Structure formats: structure tokens, C-alpha cells
């Protein structure tokens, strides 16, 4: 929490409470799943990455990603660069900025230098959303997954020929 107070001094009491709640959630997740050592949350309202190391602006987060280390002793950038498949971990209650909802967390599993497994939550999906997707898939409906940038523009798609970059 070293630089946490720097970012919350001027924030409203409500914002301070929510940011502290997010930090507590990270601590809870890390204590519950010690193999997950690259956990962070992003508060779009505040433009901050909340990590176990404190709060970072987007610029700071990406500058620091080479110096922040995971509990397995790797740099955060190593964890981000690791090319490993998705794996389903668990359903958990996630108290986020906007809701207290049951989420399905998909984890990218990696092994640290010490041989201890660790990982990174790369996608949290509300269980209701995932249920709807699975219903459509089982009904034979054609679905396309699209990755969007912050402005809502398509970056990548699971369907060949889907327009991106427009």
C-alpha cells in the first residue's frame, strides 16, 4: 500500500472505500490461492491498476512491470509474456467496483522458477453471462468472440474475415 494514499488523498470517501475494498480483494485472493501471484484489478473510473504492490497509473504500471516481481521470483512482465493456455480454476464470489457477483475465473497457469505453480487471472466472467453463452453454443448458434480496445474498436476476432481496426 506504499503509494496507495498518494492516489486516494483527493478521492471522495466513496472512491477511497471502493479502492481499499479492491486492495483487500486482491489480498484475499492471494491468501486463498497462493499459486496466483500476478493478481491485479483495474479501476477504469480512477484509471488505476490496483496490485499487491500498491496503486499505479497505467503509465507507471507498464514502466514498473519489469521491476515488480511475483512471489515465484519472476518479473511481472515475464508473467505477462508467458505463452500458456487458459485453464479454468474456480467459481468465486468477487466483490468488484460495480457489483458483488459470482464470477468464473480463467487462469493462465505457469510454473515459477522454483517449480511452484503460479498464474494470472486473465478473465473474470459473470457466471450468468457464461451460462448464456453455453446455452447459445449448445443450441448450435454461431458465436464470435471479439476483443475490443478502450474506445470499443475491434482489435481481434475469433471469426475469420471479421473487420478489425475500423
Descriptions of predicted regions:
Residues 1-21, 42-60:
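Extracellular/periplasmic ligand-binding regions of membrane signal-transduction receptors
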Residues 1-3, 11, 64, 71-74, ...:
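General structural signal for secondary-structure boundaries
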Residues 2-5, 37, 141:
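Secondary-structure transition/capping residues
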Residues 19-25, 69-74:
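Well-ordered, non-membrane alpha-helical segments in soluble/globular domains
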Residues 21-33, 112-162:
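Solvent-exposed, extracytoplasmic
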Residues 31-124:
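Extracytoplasmic/periplasmic ligand-binding sensor regions of membrane-associated signaling proteins
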Residues 51-61, 153-166:
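GAF sensory domains
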Amino acid at each position: 500500500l506504499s503509494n496507495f494514499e498518494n492516489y486516494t488523498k483527493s478521492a471522495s470517501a466513496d472512491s477511497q472505500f471502493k479502492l481499499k475494498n479492491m486492495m483487500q480483494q486482491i489480498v484475499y485472493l492471494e491468501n486463498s490461492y497462493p499459486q496466483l501471484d500476478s493478481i491485479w484489478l483495474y479501476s477504469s473510473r480512477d484509471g488505476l491498476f490496483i496490485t499487491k504492490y500498491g496503486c499505479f497509473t497505467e503509465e507507471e504500471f507498464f514502466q514498473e512491470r519489469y521491476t515488480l516481481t511475483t512471489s515465484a521470483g519472476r518479473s511481472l512482465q515475464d508473467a505477462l509474456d508467458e505463452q500458456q493456455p487458459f485453464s479454468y480454476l474456480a467459481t468465486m464470489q468477487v466483490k468488484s467496483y460495480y457489483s458483488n457477483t459470482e464470477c468464473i475465473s480463467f487462469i493462465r497457469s505457469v510454473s515459477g522458477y522454483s517449480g511452484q505453480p503460479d498464474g494470472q487471472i486473465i478473465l473474470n466472467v459473470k457466471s450468468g453471462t457464461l451460462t448464456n453463452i453455453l446455452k447459445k453454443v449448445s443450441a448450435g448458434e454461431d458465436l464470435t468472440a471479439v476483443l475490443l480496445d478502450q474506445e470499443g474498436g475491434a482489435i481481434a476476432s475469433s471469426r475469420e474475415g471479421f473487420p478489425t481496426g475500423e
